[in-house]
Design a protein with these regions (language model features):
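Extended beta-strand/beta-hairpin segments
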Residues: 1-155
Length: 155
């Protein structure tokens, strides 16, 4: 059972692109890491532009976003859908309080330009069944997944 946060104390934000090799755009409060996919030859792990003291919420959002982006790719491949090169995932993880208890909650925005909204939504929801981070938090924290409107084609 999840509990609604009454007061947000801190928000960790990440932006992950489909390729993940180009890094994330710079922002005032975003953790900017170049991520790699395990098991791919020539895909060295690199941490670039690391902030001096990233918050745990930023690190969790970054790890989840990398994993979830990979899960989107796996689900799309199984559904024979080609993801656009400019696909992206934004995850925000809030640390907050309700009374004297601390909780986290998350928002996930998925952008798949050129993919029909219903197809993108089906891929995004199915990716939660693949991603270990999504499975770990399922039923434990509030998670809102949104497909951000883009110039998608009709279904």
């Amino acid at each position: 059972m999840t509990t609604k946060i009454q007061t947000v104390l801190l928000t960790g934000k990440t932006h992950t692109t489909g390729s993940r090799r180009e890094g994330a755009p710079h922002g005032d409060d975003r953790l900017d890491l170049q991520l790699s996919t395990p098991g791919n030859a020539g895909n060295d792990i690199a941490f670039t532009a690391i902030q001096a003291h990233p918050a745990a919420e930023q690190l969790f959002a970054g790890a989840w976003s990398a994993c979830y982006t990979g899960a989107l790719g796996l689900v799309a491949k199984a559904k024979k859908v080609t993801l656009p090169s400019d696909m992206s995932v934004d995850i925000e993880v809030d640390l907050g309080k309700t009374g004297s208890a601390y909780f986290i909650q998350a928002r996930i925005d998925v952008r798949m330009p050129g993919v029909a909204h219903d197809v993108a939504e089906a891929i995004a929801q199915a990716a939660h069944d693949v991603c270990p981070y999504s499975k770990a938090v399922h039923g434990n924290i509030d998670v809102a997944t949104n497909i951000v409107a883009t110039d998608a084609v009709a279904a």
